[in-house]
């Protein structure tokens, strides 16, 4: 076997699944001038959050009758404010065609991935008929299955005992995340369930990243760059206005509003 053959057998890449936190900008109106002004206000509040932020542009909630969307101009508005569009989420043919012309990936509309199963099977077989009882013969009543109460679903918990340094990202897939030390600025905590930080929380904490609105965040000292539950977030500039800044807090979601209460 030649050296070239040996090199061909040595893989040069791997395909891996990953759960990444990506911001979704859900466009509510086709008004780029107003979008520019409102984005500028947001960037002024949290410039670090918007610097080179990966983004999915959601166009599937745009109301009908607002005219054709200028997608290249929309992407340029986002680019000027530090948002890097990775893909769009759209359902209208004209938006999909515009994205394809820009070689931009298109994701299905919100909820389109969850469809009822289309079972194309033959008609169900009829159960075999039981012989009818003879006259005077009592038919035995079928025994009732004993109903057992549903067991509570336990979620796996990931426990981190060492400080989480800036630049580190820790993700608890399918469950809760518990950190028994400090979380530095620039660090990122993600969990499908709840997040508990038994120390100063100075980085980012994103709970319920797969959409669990019942997820909570608990920390001993709120000094976070960002807290988020099911995609609803507050950045440091918003958090500092809270009287709970620097204190032990509990963060929960009510509708689309984050509530921060003292522990």
Curated annotation (Swiss-Prot):
NCBIfam families: minC. GO terms for biological process: cell morphogenesis; division septum assembly; regulation of cell division; regulation of cell septum assembly. HAMAP family: MinC. Cell division inhibitor that blocks the formation of polar Z ring septums. Rapidly oscillates between the poles of the cell to destabilize FtsZ filaments that have formed before they mature into polar Z rings. Prevents FtsZ polymerization. The keyword Cell cycle applies. Residues 107-159 are annotated as: Disordered. Belongs to the MinC family. The lineage of its organism: Bacteria, Pseudomonadati, Pseudomonadota, Gammaproteobacteria, Pseudomonadales. Keywords: Cell cycle, Cell division, Septation. This is Probable septum site-determining protein MinC. It comes from Pseudomonas aeruginosa (strain ATCC 15692 / DSM 22644 / CIP 104116 / JCM 14847 / LMG 12228 / 1C / PRS 101 / PAO1). Transmembrane segments: none annotated. Interacts with MinD and FtsZ. InterPro entries: CAP/MinC_C, MinC, MinC_C_sf, MinC_N, Septum_form_inhib_MinC_C. It holds the Pfam family MinC_N. Residues 112-129, 138-150 have a biased composition (Basic and acidic residues). It comes from the Bacteria.
């Amino acid at each position: 076997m030649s050296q070239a053959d040996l090199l061909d057998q040595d893989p040069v890449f791997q395909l891996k699944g990953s759960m990444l936190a990506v911001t979704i900008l859900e466009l509510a109106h086709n008004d780029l001038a107003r979008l520019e002004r409102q984005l500028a206000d947001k960037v002024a509040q949290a410039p670090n959050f918007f610097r080179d932020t990966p983004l999915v542009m959601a166009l599937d909630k745009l109301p009908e009758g607002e005219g054709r969307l200028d997608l290249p101009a929309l992407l340029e508005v986002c680019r000027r404010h530090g948002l890097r569009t990775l893909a769009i989420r759209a359902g209208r043919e004209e938006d999909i065609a515009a994205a394809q012309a820009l070689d931009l990936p298109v994701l299905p509309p919100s909820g389109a991935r969850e469809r009822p199963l289309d079972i194309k099977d033959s008609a169900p077989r009829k159960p075999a008929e039981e012989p009818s009882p003879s006259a005077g013969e009592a038919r035995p009543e079928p025994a009732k299955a004993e109903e057992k109460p549903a067991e509570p679903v336990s979620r796996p918990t990931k426990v981190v005992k060492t400080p989480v340094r800036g630049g580190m990202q820790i993700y608890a897939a399918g469950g809760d995340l518990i950190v028994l030390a400090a979380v530095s600025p620039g660090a990122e905590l993600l969990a499908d369930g709840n997040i508990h930080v038994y120390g100063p929380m100075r980085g980012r904490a994103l709970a319920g990243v797969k959409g669990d609105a019942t997820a909570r965040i608990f920390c001993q000292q709120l000094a976070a760059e960002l807290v988020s539950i099911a995609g609803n977030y507050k950045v440091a500039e918003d958090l500092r206005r809270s009287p709970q800044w620097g204190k032990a807090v509990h963060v929960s979601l009510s509708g689309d509003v984050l509530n921060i209460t003292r522990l």
